[in-house]
């Protein structure tokens, strides 16, 4: 596992920071006690290789809660990815049947913790009771505009400022976001674990364009075809207590940073996960 581990000698409590490895990681609680789980979703992507040259992707949401471990147990962590380039698929936000977005840009991957290992979050659609916590990823933005932030319990809508651009809505606690498309374009809405996307064919834009993908999340954000801005994915609190979520565009309150040293308005880049042991029983 790729992580940074620090020991607080004053309290004899441990902290584990898990970064994006593009695979499922595991953590076994060493002793019975309370563990604070913190998750940050990943930021979306834009069309330009120059950051923020044309538009702004949505930033990742945040979730936290307390896991009360009554016996040593193993939990599984999937940290969302901001895709490595504008057309690649982000880990923990991969639509079935797609290997890239050709022309377009992906949404940020969700970050989640589960009690079993079934791979990416989308594979838990029939096993939702195994999901402890989710932080939604931000929506992509193909051209001028703003991708929707990863949500609290509802992802934020995208906002395109181009004449032909469409916008995707954020995912919610019960439904995926709606993908905005031009007439005649293909539309795939957000769904459990995965952001939606649109597809513009030669008749509408003289290109084969996947536009912007919604952020991953409990329910993924809606995408947007051809020059659009996609919605963010929703966050989720499941098998933990004292849970709360903070959207990726929230200014009050702000999110804590993964290193615990400051605050931020949304998560930039890849997601993250922090596990802190709070008590011994």
Task: Label each residue range with its predicted role.
Residues 29-36, 70-74:
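Extended extracellular/luminal ectodomain segments enriched in beta-structured repeat modules
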Residues 34-43, 77:
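A short beta-strand element within beta-rich, extracytoplasmic domains
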Residues 46-58:
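Short, surface-exposed beta-strand/strand-loop-strand elements in extracellular ectodomains
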Residues 57-166:
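Secretome/extracellular-domain signature
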Residues 90-123, 146-153, 191-237:
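Catalytic nucleophile loop of clan PA
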Residues 130-132, 155-217, 221:
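Acidic, glycine-rich loop-and-strand cores that form catalytic or ligand-binding grooves
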């Amino acid at each position: 596992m790729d992580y940074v581990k620090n020991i607080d000698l004053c309290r004899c409590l441990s902290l584990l920071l898990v970064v994006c490895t593009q695979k499922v990681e595991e953590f076994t609680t060493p002793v019975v006690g309370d563990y604070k789980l913190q998750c940050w979703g990943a930021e979306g992507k834009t069309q330009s290789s120059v950051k923020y040259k044309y538009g702004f992707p949505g930033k990742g949401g945040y979730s936290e809660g307390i896991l009360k471990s009554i016996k040593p147990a193993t939990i599984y962590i999937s940290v969302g990815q901001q895709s490595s380039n504008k057309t690649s698929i982000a880990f923990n936000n991969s639509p079935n049947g797609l290997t890239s977005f050709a022309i377009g840009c992906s949404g940020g991957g969700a970050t989640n913790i589960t009690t079993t290992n079934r791979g990416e979050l989308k594979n838990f659609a029939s096993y939702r009771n195994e999901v402890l916590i989710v932080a939604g990823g931000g929506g992509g933005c193909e051209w001028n505009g703003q991708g929707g932030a990863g949500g609290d319990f509802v992802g934020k809508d995208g906002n395109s400022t181009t004449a032909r651009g469409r916008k995707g809505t954020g995912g919610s606690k019960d439904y995926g976001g709606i993908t905005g498309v031009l007439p005649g374009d293909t539309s795939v809405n957000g769904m459990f674990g995965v952001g939606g996307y649109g597809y513009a064919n030669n008749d509408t834009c003289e290109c084969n364009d996947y536009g912007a993908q919604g952020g991953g999340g409990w329910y993924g954000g809606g995408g947007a075809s051809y020059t659009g801005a996609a919605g963010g994915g929703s966050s989720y609190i499941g098998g933990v207590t004292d849970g709360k979520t903070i959207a990726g565009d929230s200014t009050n309150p702000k999110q804590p940073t993964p290193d615990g040293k400051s605050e931020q308005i949304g998560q930039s880049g890849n997601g993250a996960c922090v596990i802190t042991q709070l008590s011994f029983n």
